[in-house]
Amino acid sequence: MNTYAKYNQSEQDYLESIFLLLKEKSIVHRIDVAKKMSVSQAAVNKAMKNLSEKGYIYEDGKHLYLTETGKKYAEEVYEKHCIIRDFLQKIGVSPAKAEDDACHMEHLVSHETVLAMKQFLKR
């Protein structure tokens, strides 16, 4: 969990969404991403073009897949999200609020802070 800081929030959100969709089902389409993120098809098309050019995703027909680099990055983002969510729940935040806050905080909290949260959760 070390590289997420150099990517922008939009990339993180799209890759995390694709990662989670792929965990749910083996075939993911652009429309699935649009629905999950509550964004337009045009926004997804633009993001997929950008992510493809950067080597994070590829498409086989109409199906989306993460490259090894994209998968590693998405896993790091998701791990950060889970650590923050779990930390917030541990200190008494409701599960729904912890999930919502983690979505926002994952883009702002430093690597050092996430590591400290992770260590705290191990106690």
Regions found by a protein language model. Name each.
Residues 36, 73, 90:
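Residues within the alpha-helical elements of helix-turn-helix
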Residues 2-39:
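N-terminal helix-turn-helix DNA-binding core of bacterial DNA-binding proteins
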Residues 42, 96:
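Key DNA-contact positions within bacterial/archaeal DNA-binding proteins
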Residues 62-80:
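Basic, amphipathic "hinge/linker" alpha-helix immediately C-terminal to the N-terminal HTH DNA-binding motif
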Residues 76-91, 97, 101-104:
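Short, solvent-exposed amphipathic helices
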Residues 52-61:
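A short, conserved structural fragment
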Residues 14, 33, 44-52:
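Basic amphipathic alpha-helical segments that dock to polyanions
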Residues 100-123:
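C-terminal regulatory/oligomerization modules of transcriptional regulators
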